[in-house]
Amino acid sequence: MCSSDLQSRVDWREALREFVSTTCSGNDYSTWRRPNRRYISAGVYLPSGITETVGELIIAIDTSGSIGGRELSQFLGEVCAIAKAVKPQAVRLLYWDTKVCRDEYYMQDQLDDIVKSTKPAGGGGTMVECVPEYMREKQMRPQAVIILTDGYLGGSWGTWDVPTLWCILDNKHTTASVGKTLHIDSSDM
């Protein structure tokens, strides 16, 4: 039996990077339709490699009042760094409480501006099922969803059709019933 002082701590930034890089990696494959030009002059015909780009990444942020500005800013800074490394075609921020209050869309060349230009909205209760409902209503098909919340939900965890990572802030006793859960201690931010 381990006391809470002896339990290993996972760096949430590394865990977040790991989720994004494994879930959202572009598809690499090779094709014989276009031979690799580097070897043709030597008379060797090899397939050329093709990498598909990463599509859209959705970041859904709980704005029910329990997520402070400091945590939000640091989390978005880390997400921005991850997005630069993975290079998704777009990042969509969804601010939610009992409904999606704001939907912001950033193309790949705008990722540096996320922290400076975002305008969080909300402040009501906490009903996360509004996020997958909104995504279905708007026919969004992201490669993955990252949710930042304190885990104190007023309803269910929702039904998700895409890989989902729950970043639960300062609530070690709550684990999402769908997707992967990452617990974050605000003192680590």
Feature roles, as predicted:
Residues 1-3:
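Short, small-residue-biased leader/transition segments that mark boundaries at the very start
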Residues 8-13:
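Extended, H/D-rich, highly charged conserved domains that either
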Residues 16:
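N-terminal basic, Ser/Thr-rich segments that initiate or prime the first beta/alpha elements at protein or domain
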Residues 24, 52-108, 130-149, 153, ...:
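Von Willebrand factor
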Residues 29-43, 49:
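Active-site-proximal or metal-binding-adjacent scaffold patches in catalytic folds
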Residues 103-128, 182-189:
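Acidic, Ser/Thr-rich peripheral helices and adjacent loops at domain boundaries
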Residues 152-189:
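VWA/integrin I-like adhesion module and closely mimicked acidic/polar interface patches used
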